[in-house]
């Protein structure tokens, strides 16, 4: 930590022309406020969502549901992803838990749709990758 603090002090010295202990304390307080504003619970929740997408099967399911713009039956999703029924069920459970898909029973069929959160994330991701 001492090495990091010294480097931080050198950075402030370069930025301010002269760095005093008060400058270091003030900037550390400002950075602490930024960190506190994030909130541990919020960061954990966001990481849970990203973790749910960090699997090819789950991400493919989300992409298909977003592209479909309608509910799809589990049997339709199973035709798209190359996993066992158990694997599909596990993936869908993780996506429901992360708030990326909603499921409902329709008679003897289980149907799923993408949530607004899933649509927003896929939209952002599509815009972050170029086709080049």
Give the role of each language-model region:
Residues 69-70, 96, 126:
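Residue-level detector of secondary-structure transition/capping positions
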Residues 40-84, 110-112:
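N-terminal helix-turn-helix DNA-binding core of bacterial DNA-binding proteins
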Residues 97-106, 113:
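Beta-hairpin "wing" of winged helix-turn-helix
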Residues 1-52, 100:
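N-terminal leader segment of winged-helix/HTH proteins
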Residues 79, 96-97:
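Alpha-helical residues within the helix-turn-helix
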Residues 111-132:
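Conserved segment of winged-helix/HTH DNA-binding domains
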Residues 92-93:
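Short, hydrophobic-biased segments on the C-terminal half of alpha helices
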